[in-house]
Amino acid sequence: MTEDAKTSLSSADIIEIMKLLPHRYPFLMVDRIIEIDSDNSAIGIKNVTANEPQFTGHFPGSPIMPGVLLIEGMAQTAGAICARKDGIGGNLVYFMTIDNARFRKPVVPGDRVEFHVVKQKQRGTIWKFHCDAKVDGSVVAEADIGAMIVRKDPDQA
């Protein structure tokens, strides 16, 4: 990613997200990033649909988005901030910690989840974020997460 692209990107469609993150279907949990504020915050979007594979077993007849996938959506939104800031290209952003996770309301097919991610601090390759997942303006989940940029082994490329 060029220096101009790193500084000018204020939103990202799915194509741009796939340049920032290594995740792919069915594990890419962010469909769009509607706002990236420098390296400080971002808002990612996940449109939850009934045909996603997790709903086959969670739960038949009463589908609910697994909380761990909401956390993953938060982490991927945070990862996009890290990748954009550092222009890491082929390197990876590893999810390191989850603290203070809370699940407030169920998320179901048809919901549009907004992942609000705010950087709390950064030291070297270590980043800390506070994250909220919202549906229709109401917090459905929240967590504090940690991430680390890991330089990819060129032999594994």
UniProtKB/Swiss-Prot annotation:
The keyword Ribosomal protein does not apply. This is 3-hydroxyacyl-[acyl-carrier-protein] dehydratase FabZ. InterPro entries: FabA_FabZ (IPR013114), FabZ (IPR010084), HotDog_dom_sf (IPR029069). It is found in: Cytoplasm. The keyword Lipid metabolism applies. The active site is at residue 58. Its EC number is 4.2.1.59. It comes from Rhizobium rhizogenes (strain K84 / ATCC BAA-868) (Agrobacterium radiobacter). GO terms for molecular function: (3R)-hydroxyacyl-[acyl-carrier-protein] dehydratase activity. One of its GO terms (biological process) is fatty acid biosynthetic process. CDD domains: FabZ. It comes from the Bacteria. Keywords: Cytoplasm, Lipid A biosynthesis, Lipid biosynthesis, Lipid metabolism, Lyase. Belongs to the thioester dehydratase family. FabZ subfamily. Its main location: cytoplasm. The gene is fabZ. Involved in unsaturated fatty acids biosynthesis. Catalyzes the dehydration of short chain beta-hydroxyacyl-ACPs and long chain saturated and unsaturated beta-hydroxyacyl-ACPs. Disulfide bonds: none annotated. One of its GO terms (cellular component) is cytoplasm. It catalyses: a (3R)-hydroxyacyl-[ACP] = a (2E)-enoyl-[ACP] + H2O.
